[in-house]
Amino acid sequence: MTPRGTAEPQVRPGIAEDLTGLTNLYNHYVLRTPITFDTVPLTPEGRMQWFLSHPKDGPHRLMVAAEPAPSGPERLLGYATSSPLRPKAAYATSAEVSVYCAPDAAGRGVGTALYTALFDALAGEDLHRAYAGVTQPNDASHRLHTRFDFRPIGTYGQVGRKFGRYWDVRWYEKELGGGGADGGAGRLHQTGRM
């Protein structure tokens, strides 16, 4: 049992029935925080393409943390995704990852559980690197990402304007196990020569 007396959250792939809850959770961040640079609330219909771009297998996943309810539907506590970093083909072995937790789930290990499940699911995929963009300041996200062996690699200064001010985004990088078919580029990076 968690400190709040509820059952441990269950982490699983997202399903279509989650879409309304996922959209509501995301809209909290759209309306109240600079964590996402979306500025207009989304609808479940408007998020359908996003949902469909995260199947249950492959390199682009959606993992959901849910809390079982004694009666009625489970309650969504958060979600994590891996998405294409960029649309060009050479970026295919890189993914951008994100995690969003319900505001009242802070401190319950939901983000850790989501990233654990996401990276376990991605372990067999042809992915070489994961990247995360984190609006600054965000100490909790920094701690989460460093716990998962991400390292800060740079900051886009004042890259987004929301709520009447500019925000920096720090980028984090994590090495993954896949992406081995590099045509020798890995050797060049490691030794400085081919």
From Swiss-Prot:
Class of enzymatic activity (EC top level): transferase
Pfam families: Acetyltransf_1
Documented EC number(s): 2.3.1.-
InterPro entries noted in UniProt: Acyl_CoA_acyltransferase, GNAT_dom
Domain of life: Bacteria
A GO molecular-function descriptor: acyltransferase activity, transferring groups other than amino-acyl groups
Keyword terms of this UniProt record: Acyltransferase, Transferase
Domain (N-acetyltransferase): residue spans on this chain: 9-173
The family this protein is said to belong to: Belongs to the acetyltransferase family. PAT/BAR subfamily.
PANTHER family hit by this protein: N-ACETYLTRANSFERASE (PTHR43072), UPF0039 PROTEIN C11D3.02C (PTHR43072:SF23)
Name of the molecule in the record: N-acetyltransferase
Organism annotation: Streptomyces griseus
